[in-house]
Swiss-Prot record:
Originating gene: rev
Protein's name according to its UniProt entry: Protein Rev
Location of the region described as Disordered in the Swiss-Prot/TrEMBL record: 23-48, 92-116
Chain spans, region Homomultimerization: 18-26
Additional detail: HIV-1 lineages are divided in three main groups, M (for Major), O (for Outlier), and N (for New, or Non-M, Non-O). The vast majority of strains found worldwide belong to the group M. Group O seems to be endemic to and largely confined to Cameroon and neighboring countries in West Central Africa, where these viruses represent a small minority of HIV-1 strains. The group N is represented by a limited number of isolates from Cameroonian persons. The group M is further subdivided in 9 clades or subtypes (A to D, F to H, J and K).
Motif (Nuclear export signal and binding to XPO1): 73-84
One Gene Ontology term from the biological process aspect of the record: mRNA transport
């Protein structure tokens, strides 16, 4: 399935069925009763949904050996990022790709808004 190496299709299907069963075991609350009773039922339902989501993530990481979501990309602080066009930038859209330059002392880009 979907080109996953190392994962058998049966394990993936079994995991998906288990997670589907968890979500089906918590149907949305009914619309009967007073406003306060409905609000309490929705609050408890949302809490159960959060617990099911947490359990599902743990099941995915345990059975499939990987997290449910990709690891976020670590970026340097915004203060250190600059656009440096001292060299001939050219008109090509791909020039300089793959070689990002990070200057430690960045020039002031935004000033007070007054021209000198």
């Amino acid at each position: 399935m979907a080109g996953r190496s190392g994962d058998s299709d049966e394990d993936l299907l079994k995991t998906v069925r288990l997670i589907k069963f968890l979500y089906q075991s918590n149907p949305p609350p009914s619309n009967e009763g007073t406003r306060q009773a409905r609000r309490n039922r929705r609050r408890r339902w949302r809490e159960r949904q959060r617990q099911i989501r947490t359990i599902s993530e743990r099941i995915l990481s345990t059975y499939l050996g990987r997290p449910a979501e990709p690891v976020p990309l670590q970026l340097p602080p915004l203060e250190r990022l600059t656009l440096d066009c001292n060299e001939d930038c050219g008109t090509s859209g791909t020039q300089g790709v793959g070689n990002p330059e990070i200057l430690v002392e960045s020039p002031t880009v935004l000033e007070s808004g007054t021209k000198e």
